[in-house]
Amino acid sequence: MERKHIITISGKPGSGKSSTADKVAELLGYTRYSSGDMVRNILAREHMTLAEYNEKANDDHALDTKIDEYLRGLRTKKDVIIDSRLGFYWLPESFKVYLDLDMQVATVRIYKDAVSNNMRTKSGEVASSLDAVSKQVRERMENERRRFKEMYNVDPYNIEHFDLVIDTSRHTPQTVALTVYDHYRQWLKTDTWKQVRSSIPLGYSFKNQY
C-alpha cells in the first residue's frame, strides 16, 4: 500500500504544534496548512476573542463546520503538513502525530507567550496569571472534548488515535521536528505500523542520514 505523503499534527495547547509543523515542513520541503491560522483570521475578521469563539461554538457549530470542510478539502493534497486539532480525524490515512506535555509546562509556555505577544494578550487568548492560564487551558480542553464528542463522537485528546506520540515538555520544536521526520520516513517504508510513544533522548539528532 502506498502511503499518503501527509502529516497531521495535533496535541495539547502549548505543546508546540505550530512551531513543530513549520520545522517539519521545512525539513521535508512540504507545504504547511493550519486550522489555527484559519481560526485566528476568523477572530480578527469578526472582532472576537478565542474565549468568545469557544463559547459561541458550543451552540453554533457553523464555525467548526467551516474549518472541517477546509480540512476535508486537503485530502487531495500531497506533500503537506497539517496543524489541526481534528486533522487526524478528517485525514485518517495521514501520519498522525500527537504532541503531549505536562500541564504545568503548558501553562508556563502559554503565559510567557502572552507576555511577549501583546496582540494575543489583547485577543483574550490567555489570562493574566499562571493560575488563570491553567484554569483557562483546562476549561478549553474540556470544552473541546465535549463539543467534538457531541459533533463527531471523537476525543481529540485521546492518544490512541495517533501513530506517533511525543512528550514535548523538555524539548525544543527543532528536536521534536527531527523526531517526527525520522519516524515519518520509517512509516513511509512500511505497510504496518504500531503506535510509537517517543521519549526523546537529550541531544537527539538524526538516527539515519537520508
PLM ranges: what are they?
Residues S18:
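Walker A/P-loop
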Residues S15:
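ATP-binding Walker
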Residues E26-Y33:
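Post-Walker A helix-loop "phosphate-sensing" segment adjacent to the P-loop in P-loop NTPases
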Residues K12:
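P-loop (Walker A) phosphate-binding loop of NTP-binding proteins
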Residues I9:
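Hydrophobic anchor at the beta1->P-loop junction of P-loop NTPases
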Residues T121-V176, W193, R197-Y210:
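Small-molecule kinase domains that catalyze NTP-dependent phosphoryl transfer to phosphate-bearing small molecules
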Residues S35-P92, Q104, K112-E125, D131, ...:
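ATP-dependent small-molecule kinase phosphotransfer cores
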